[in-house]
Amino acid sequence: MTQTDSKATQGDQLPGGILMKAIVYTQYGPPDVLQLKEVAKPTPKDKEVLIRIDATTVTAADCELRSLKLPIWLRLPIRIYLGLIRPRNKILGQDLAGEIEAVGKEVTRFKKGDQVFGWTGFRLGAYAEYTCLSEDGVLAIKPATMTYEEAAAVPLGGLNALHFLRNGNVQSGQKVLIQGAGGSIGTFAVQLAKYFGAEVTAVDSTGKLDMLRSIGADHVIDYTQEDFTKNGETYDVIFDVVGKSSFTRSVRSLKHNGRYLLANPRLSQMVRGRWTSRRSSKQVIVGAASEKTEDLLFLKELIEAGKIQSVIDRGYPLEHIAEAHRYVDTGHKKGNVVITVE
């Protein structure tokens, strides 16, 4: 159970004493560091909107930022950005969906009452009743066909999947394999690769295979029973979402001019990837999704056209977010874990 503290920390309370509920963490560590507190309700600046959040998510990325259990090469840069000893930004959360409650005086794209969904990126702040975002941020009107919970599950997974598949130049008729296909990024990658016309092989654990078939995977592989790098198949694109595939064997499983996409690379994979890309016809591509509103709008169009959907495994109320983090830490979630904010 998330701990509750009804006192705002010093300096948090705004004139007038307007407070909101938020999940706060003041140290890195296990899910129990997450505490339900009352903090100052933010006020939008001239070019910002104030969003009343109805739903957010718990992703593997949120858990990594909470615990700092990251690849070695990322730990120091992330600590420098987030806070060396303790987090500077004490409210996690990147995905959100909700309603605009107020707008700054220079805002033109949105108005009060608009139902929106968006991504805060490393600004974080979505584990709360309210947050402010720039009107030029990754924010758009919510798909008309989706609930707040379904819409909140789109941004991080959808934007990352779209980023990598575009960088991998996925084309109609190509063979694409997605390792770790059952998570938030992977489920969107399967659907987007199918939309782009690819023949998709989805790799994950036994309990996720039926779900992966249901969202369009042409072939599924249970990694607990079969190593895809040893079945003799070759692929135009291999997208490793989770960083668990063998670098050497994956590269060997690529066709001539194939692309190996790494969403969560180890340092050794990055070094070897540069060498492989320079010395062979095969390309190794790493990186993170850029924050582009037009990409979110593209995903919205596909959603409203019925081409892609969010996959939701479980839902929790904000007060039980520590329990949600414990579940995501197991690595067994199917698609997304959604948090409702009331």
Language-model segments: which ranges?
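C-terminal hydrophobic helical "lid"/dimerization subdomain
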Residues: 3, 7-17, 292-342
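Short glycine-centered segments of the SAM/dcSAM-binding site in methyltransferase folds
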Residues: 115, 175, 258-259
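A structural motif shared across PLP-dependent enzymes of the aminotransferase-like
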Residues: 122-135
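Mid-domain Rossmann-like dinucleotide-binding core that forms the NAD(H)/NADP(H) cofactor-binding site
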Residues: 151-222
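Glycine-rich phosphate-binding loop and adjacent beta-alpha segment
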Residues: 204, 242-308, 340-342
